[in-house]
Every structure is written in structure tokens, then in C-alpha cells.
Amino acid sequence: MSVNTNIPPILVRREGAVLVLAIHTPGKRNAISPGLSDPLTEALNAARPDADIGAVVLTGADGYFCSGGDLNVLATRRLLTPQQRRGELGGLHGLIRLLRDFPKPVVASVEGGAAGAGLSMALGCDLLVAARDATFSVAYIKVGLTPDG
């Protein structure tokens, strides 16, 4: 099975003064991999000085917020040194700090599930709005990890 690398991992749109960032990894319930934090961080950093943006909404595409780390990618990382792992996780940890400290309101709009790192991103936001079908799971222990790396 081939992977379409042309699919953007983040969908960005404007709705008036609101910047909407949607995690978009189709077929994986919006699982995240090491490079996913980069486009989110770039979009937030671009929004910071933009006076026309009053708030940010972080959500997931296709009715699911984020299932956490992509287990297929994580399995390939088991041979990394601790320093290499810290480097990869640094982007995600930096993103969560950026969400927490962002100077404009950031709202997590959660449909479906928010698990593992997806839950951490949602909790980094100023406000979390959950749909009736929303579920939340720390999930790390299920795959032998400690929370957030």
C-alpha cells in the first residue's frame, strides 16, 4: 500500500477572525508523527502578529480530534538513542507550550477521540469544547510509554 505524501497533515482555513487548524491524517484517526508539530507551530507563529486573527480553533478532520502518536511510526523509533527521542519529542512539547502560552485564545474543538498526545494538545488550549461523542484517554500506558515522552 502506498502512502500519499501530497496530503497536508494540517488543514488551515479562516472563518472571519478565527483561524481553524485541523489535524488531517486520513485513515489514521488523525494520528500524529514527529513532523506534524512543525506545520502547526508555523501556522500559530504566523497567526501571532496577525491583528486580523482574534482566536484559533484546533480540531481534527473527519470527525475525530487525534488518536495520539502514530503507532506505526513509533515502532520504527524504538532504536533511537534517548537524545534522538528527545529531539523528536521536543517539537511536540514545544507545540504544547506554544498552545498554552499563545497570546490569543486557543479553543480545542473535540469530536470523536482525543488520546495520548492528542489529549495533551487539547489540554494545552485555553478552552476545550467537547462534542457529545467525545472521548478522552491518556493511552500512553497501553503502548508502553510514559505521558508526553
Which residues are covered by each model-predicted region?
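Conserved CoA-thioester-binding segment of acyl-CoA-metabolizing enzymes
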Residues: 1-61, 83, 97
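Hydrophobic/aromatic residues within transmembrane alpha-helices
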Residues: 21, 58, 70, 121-123
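Phosphate-coordinating loops and pocket residues in cytosolic domains that bind phosphorylated ligands
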Residues: 31-34, 67, 76, 142
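Glycine- (often His-adjacent) and acidic-residue-rich active-site loop
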Residues: 60-97, 114
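Glycine-rich beta-to-alpha active-site loop
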Residues: 95-145
